Amino acid sequence: MVGRAVLARLTADKNSAYAVVHILGRRAPELPAGAPSARLVSHVSKSLLEAQVPPADDMFIALGTTISVAGSQSAFRALDLDAVLALARAARAAGVRRLGVVSAMGADAGSQVFYNRVKGEMELAVSALGFDTVVIARPSLLDGERAALGQPTRRGEQLALKVMRVLKPLIPRNYQAISDTQVAKALVEAVLAGRPGVQILLSGQMQPR
C-alpha cells in the first residue's frame, strides 16, 4: 500500500523534485489517476533478486508481506529481507545516493519474534551499504485500501483496525493505526530533505499533528 501512495506523491503535479520516475516491480503498476505518463518509466522483473536498477538519485523500497500471506517463514524472509537487500544493493551500484525504505514498528535484529527480527536485519543490512542518506519508515498497522491492489483481505487486521479506531485516544501514538498516505508523505519528505546518515521515522512521528 505504501508503495502505491509513494508513487502517487512522486507523480503529483505539485511535486517537481523528480523529472523522471522509474517504477520497478514484479508486474506493471496501476498508475494513479492523472499521473503524467511522460515522466514515468515502468520496469517489470519477475525476479526482484535479479532486477536491474536504472541510474537515479533516490530510491524508495516498499516491499512487504506477512508470514501467513507468504506461506512460510522462508518465503517471508525472501521478500522482506532478501529482495529488499538485493534492490538496495542494485540501487547503490547504479549510483543512487538516497534511499527510503519501509520497515515496521518493532523492527529489531535481536528480537525473539521472527517478523521483527527479519525487519531489523533488513534495516541493518541496507544501512551498511554506504548511501549518503537512508530513511527507514517504521509504521504501525497500516490503514488503506488493500483491495485496490488486489491484496487478500486480512480479517484479523480489519478487526484490529476497527478496534484501534475506537480506542485511538488510549493508544500510544507509535502504535496507533496509520494511513499509507501519511507514511508516504513522511518518507518522501525525509528523503528529499537529505539528512546525512541513517534516520528512523517511528510511526508516531509520521502521524499528522
Show the residue positions of the predicted features.
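Conserved Rossmann-fold NAD(P)-dependent oxidoreductase catalytic core, especially the SDR/UDP-sugar
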Residues: M1, G71-Q73, A78-L124, A128, ...
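N-terminal Rossmann NAD(P)H-binding glycine-rich loop of SDR-like oxidoreductase domains
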Residues: M1-S16
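Short helix-capping segments at alpha-helix termini
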Residues: K14-A17, A33-A35, L129-G130
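N-terminal Rossmann-fold cofactor-binding loop
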Residues: L24-A28
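Oxidoreductase cofactor-interface core, primarily capturing Rossmann-like NAD(P)-dependent enzymes
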Residues: A56, A109-R209
